[in-house]
Amino acid sequence: MTIKVNCIGYPRIGPKRELKNALEKYWKSEISEADLLKCASELKKNNWQTQKDNGVDYICSNDFSFYDQVLDTICLVGSIPERYKHKDDKVSFKTYFAMARGSQTKDLDVPALEMTKWFDTNYHYLVPEFSKNQKFKLSSNKPFDEFDEAKKLGFNTKPIILGPLTFLSLGKTTDETFKSIDLLDNLLPVYAEILSVLNKKGAEWIQIDEPILVKNQNADFTKLIKKTLNQLKKFAGSSKIILTTYFEKLDSEIEKEILESDVDGIHLDLIRGKISNINSLRDINKTISIGIIDGRNIWKSDVNKKIEQVLEYSKFIKNLWISSSCPLLH
């Protein structure tokens, strides 16, 4: 039996709100794009070092964002609405921040994307927009660049990617003749490319975030889960996939679908939820990451109680990771 420490997402604003301050200066044209990128690099470096210094075995990358992780995914898969006039192979800062904040220039006069709450947190995300003939294309190197950036500094990280089921489910359609999840087959080839590149770069583990799975889903959606996860695992090749859920308990049927899939691990929020049938984990050859530290408050945990929890779960789980209930930015 092995026990490891797993970080599923680290705060990005900086201990002195460095990112917020740099962004405000950038938007006022008081600093350059290069200055903003330098600030981001320093924050990421400090975050990785902090995790290493505190004994984290699985340090994460691609959890940093200049705005929010859903907007980053919009850019990653190239689902930029036509009104933003994106024509280049890769999404520029100009287009990125036009979607985030709107643009009132001679060349581009558009409102921002709609914003709504990220599940039941105080954080918000920009809502993806999908048309019936939506095309997807790899349009950002962000996860690859950040993995390489960490590697050059001596950190072997676990890249985090927002999963396709959550990404589509959080979006809205331009008309009512189709559902966003209908675009799954169109989207998956881009995920194949993303996971293949990360595999070639040497990622041992890749974290796929699918928090939408904690929400009540209909039978048609539930049928997609195992099939989709199996495809993602196939795309990743020799890299291992840990499917990460948080904010609530998984429905027992959805939990069963995940455990029967080909992914190598699963993260569960055990602050707001619990494992449906812990005895079922005895013969499961998967890594189980247990979110026993509350990721949604700043208070210290009762260490003795947490040790008791870990010892209890270790009786049933061969490969056990300890983590926070959700990413720490919440």
Report the location of each language-model feature:
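Domain-level signal for soluble alpha/beta catalytic cores
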Residues: 1-330
